Amino acid sequence: KECMTDGTVCYIHNHNDCCGSCLCSNGPIARPWEMMVGNCMCGPKA
């Protein structure tokens, strides 16, 4: 299965498809909300 390259927006339903990690700017507490609204991007493995 192909993974999503760095810089691809990742959401709750596909955040595990990033080649690296799904990175969100405002830390873990806001993460589910940020993933829902599309504020997270695939980036290097954390």
UniProtKB/Swiss-Prot annotation:
Keyword Mitochondrion on entry: no
Gene Ontology MF term list: sodium channel regulator activity; toxin activity
Keyword Disulfide bond recorded: yes
Keywords: Disulfide bond, Ion channel impairing toxin, Knottin, Neurotoxin, Secreted, Toxin, Voltage-gated sodium channel impairing toxin
Pfam families assigned to the protein according to its UniProt record, in alphabetical order: Toxin_28
Documented applications: Could be considered as a biological insecticide candidate, when fused to Galanthus nivalis agglutinin (GNA), a protein with the potential to cross the insect gut. This chimeric Sf1a/GNA variant shows a gain in toxicity against insects when administered orally, while maintaining similar effects as the wild-type toxin when injected. This variant has been found to be orally toxic against larvae of the tomato moth (Laconobia oleracea), the rice brown planthopper (Nilaparvata lugens), and the peach-potato aphid (Myzus persicae).
Tissues/organs with expression: Expressed by the venom gland.
Region annotation Keys region for toxin activity: where it falls in the sequence: 31-33
InterPro entries named among the record's database cross-references: Insecticidal_knottin-like_sf, Toxin_28
Cysteine pairs bridged by disulfides in the record: 3-19, 10-22, 18-42, 24-40
A GO cellular component entry from the record: extracellular region
Subcellular location: Secreted
Domain of life: Eukaryota
Protein role: Insecticidal toxin. It inhibits insect voltage-gated sodium channels (Nav) by partially blocking the channel pore (1 uM inhibits 55.7% sodium current in DUM neurons from the American cockroach), not by acting as a gating modifier. The inhibition is only partially reversible (about 25% recovery) after prolonged washout. In vivo, the toxin causes flaccid paralysis followed by death when injected into Heliothis virescens larvae. It also causes uncoordinated movements followed by full paralysis to sheep blowflies (Lucilia cuprina).
Free-text comment on this protein's domains from its UniProt entry: The presence of a 'disulfide through disulfide knot' structurally defines this protein as a knottin.
Similarity comment text for this entry: Belongs to the neurotoxin 16 (SFI) family.
Extra facts: Negative results: does not show significant effects on voltage-gated calcium channel (Cav) and voltage-gated potassium channel (Kv) currents in cockroach DUM neurons. In vivo, does not induce any toxic effects when injected intravenously into adult mice at a dose of 1.5 mg/kg body weight. Exists in two forms, due to cis-trans isomerization at 31-Arg-Pro-32.
Protein name: Mu-segestritoxin-Sf1a
The organism of origin for this protein: Segestria florentina
